Amino acid sequence: NKNIDSVHATDKDRDDDDDDDDVEAINRWYRFDSDDEIVDDGRLPSSSVSWKSGFVIDESSKPFFISSKTANETLKCGAAIAFLKNACKDEKWGDVSRTILKHFDEFFASLSKSTASTAFTSDDENNFEKLVKMLPDIISNAKRVADSAVRESLFEHYRLKAHFVALKQYLLLGQGDFIHALMESIHDELDKEIDPMSREGISQYSLRGNLDAAVRVSNACLADQHVIDALSVRLMKPLEDETGWDVFSLEYKLRAPLTTIFSDREMGRYSRAFTFLWKLKRAEYTLCELWKAMKPTVSSRFQREGLGGNIGKALEVEQARCHRVRQSMHALISDVQYYVMFEVLEPSWNEFECKLSHNAANDDLDSIIAGHENYLNSVIEKALLGTKSQVLQRSLQLIFDSVQKFKSHTFKLYEAIEDASRVRKSDQRRILEREMNQQWGVDFGESKEGEDYLSEDFVTGAKESLDSIENEFQKHVDGFLKLLPLQTHVDTSFLSFRLEATFRQGA
């Protein structure tokens, strides 16, 4: 290319040769038949591998009379064709180039009755001025043609919209039946502790089988096969005393050209959101499982089977307290979950989807990438996962820990009651059999009041343990409620109102 220096080319010292040089510069700077020529012209580096950083303007080769805006549109037009050819492997890139060049030729031909190359070297200054004036519109039209081809390739051939939806459904837990089925099938495996050195204790092969089972029994089985193939499981590096719950994550694997939009950075943010939502879902699932163990029919059965007396009355009190604590925990988890799912995820998605639909005809790849980044920014910030909400996030984690401690306490309590009930029932059968055989009297440990089946020390220990968990949970809730109004960068007013109404009554 002939480089044009704006310092030496002023309106006063221009001559006919300069005009010829200028139009020839336009000819060479804009006319290209492939991305290889773009690279040779110096506008794109030959080592470009990234859409954002791989395409740059070589100012030394840009004609001085080309504005920055027009030059940038030229760059994006060429970059779009290069992306179509190299990343999308779309054979239509040649047709797009020829269509653009045809528009150029038609315009240049309209300037002169001669051929396009003659128009470029014409001595008619009016033609040159007209060319410079109308060039931005020509380039804009060329860019629209290239952008349209890129959009068509991404959305129709590579099913970009389907992948946006899949990430919302699976990594952002929008597909409720699938997530519940996955939780049902996977929780036993994730309860296992992991050796930090060998990573033994949990099988990724088993987790993959659980994932496939959850897909089969849910509506996820109706998804396109390319979506199912992209869904996988990942185990992060475990730390000391961690279980499968701490290292498990769903993963969505994509390849070029989709990785231009779903970069490592963006997929990391999806993973971050999944980790939080998975913990929230686990807490909800845990509390629902506890309700099954604690429901009134279980308590009444214990009474029918003879765990009466002072021990029985003390257990009744503890069972009632367990119900109250579980109800408080469930109220908080449900409110937070409602906020995240219906006040954060759904509105953010609806806004993003609306922009995809309404601006589809005008969006270039940069607009799609920016729209997706804004969508994830909204999710991360409003879901209280941003850098400004780190203290609040730690407070929520302490609440999640309290839920798991309560689960451990409650299951131990009810297992002990179940064991005592079984022993009591077995003793009652033996007593009945001896009475039928006219063998009167009872052995030690067969008291009909049940005091010998569960000791007072056990009941006292259970009470103290529940006291500690309840106080700890309330402390964390108080801290969370104090921190929530400080999140001025997001609107948490409705969440604060609901939680205040639940936990500040009678305070």
What is each model feature region?
Residues 1-507:
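Extended, charged interaction scaffolds in large complex subunits
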